[in-house]
């Protein structure tokens, strides 16, 4: 067993399938943690996850999150202090509505398995196009 520690990296590690910047934090056998950031005025792509579920905690910015699973669909306001769940198979999309980036920490259970986990779905809003 080891004890891990890591600071939030200054540079992104990857771009998520939804288009947000990802900074990978820590990983254990049962889950992983990452920081997601979406620039002001941007709208993510809409995706769903095949096998993982997530818990998000919003740290900065303000925006909206669309979630749809089977016959339930909602749009919620997200801002610092808001925590929400994204069960496996849930379609979701988010957008940054403020003047600062929308930033959240997400716990993924089980750990993110890699390419192919997220798949594109039809979203609530048009995705913002930009060079990455």
Where are these regions (language model features)?
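A short, N-terminal "cap"/entry segment at the start of jelly-roll beta-barrel domains
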Residues: 1-35, 45-46, 116-132
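A short beta-loop-beta micro-motif enriched in histidine and acidic residues
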Residues: 21-32, 41-57, 71-72, 80
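Short hydrophobic/aromatic-rich beta-strand segments that constitute the beta-sheet cores
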Residues: 35, 65-67, 104
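Short beta-strand His + acidic residue motifs that chelate non-heme Fe in jelly-roll/DSBH
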Residues: 45-47, 65-66, 86, 92-99
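A short hydrophobic beta-strand segment most commonly corresponding to one strand
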Residues: 55, 99-117
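Short acidic-glycine-tyrosine-enriched beta hairpin
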Residues: 70-88
């Amino acid at each position: 067993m080891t004890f891990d520690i890591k600071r939030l990296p200054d540079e992104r590690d990857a771009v998520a399938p939804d288009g947000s910047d990802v900074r990978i934090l820590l990983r254990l056998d049962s889950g992983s943690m990452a920081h997601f950031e979406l620039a002001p005025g941007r709208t993510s792509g809409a995706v769903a996850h095949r096998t993982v579920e997530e818990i998000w905690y919003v740290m900065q910015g303000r925006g909206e999150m669309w979630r749809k699973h089977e016959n339930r669909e909602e749009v919620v306001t997200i801002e610092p202090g808001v925590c929400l769940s994204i069960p496996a198979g849930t379609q979701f999309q988010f957008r940054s509505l403020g003047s600062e980036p929308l930033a959240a920490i997400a716990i993924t259970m089980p750990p993110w398995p890699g390419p192919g986990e997220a798949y594109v779905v039809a979203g609530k809003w048009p995705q913002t196009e930009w060079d990455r």
